């Protein structure tokens, strides 16, 4: 029997997760106005390409918003919070790349 929480831990599922700006605001507690401001500053990016269309966000950007909110709640400025979040993302991407390379080397 499959665990009912599996979809929430499944990277394929999370990559397909797309949420509108109103739902993101409800889920995260971040006001819509603030989300728009962060996007206007280039800190986050919606999947919406056309002007005037509802903004929609993927899991990565929602997670980014939550991390930014955490740093802001800890007293950091928005710019510093954005830098800290990007540093963490870069660290995880580099670590994941190294693990993939090590795995490929070990299977040869």
Residue ranges and their predicted role:
Residues 1-26, 45, 51, 59-108:
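Arg/Lys-rich, alpha-helical DNA-contact motif
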Residues 31-34:
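Short coil turns linking two alpha-helices in DNA-binding domains
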Residues 38, 57:
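Conserved active-site tyrosine of GNAT-family acetyltransferases
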Residues 42:
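Glycine-centered, phosphate/nucleic-acid-interacting loop/turn motifs that mediate DNA/RNA or nucleotide
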Residues 54:
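Conserved catalytic core of two-component sensor histidine kinases, primarily the HATPase_c ATP-binding
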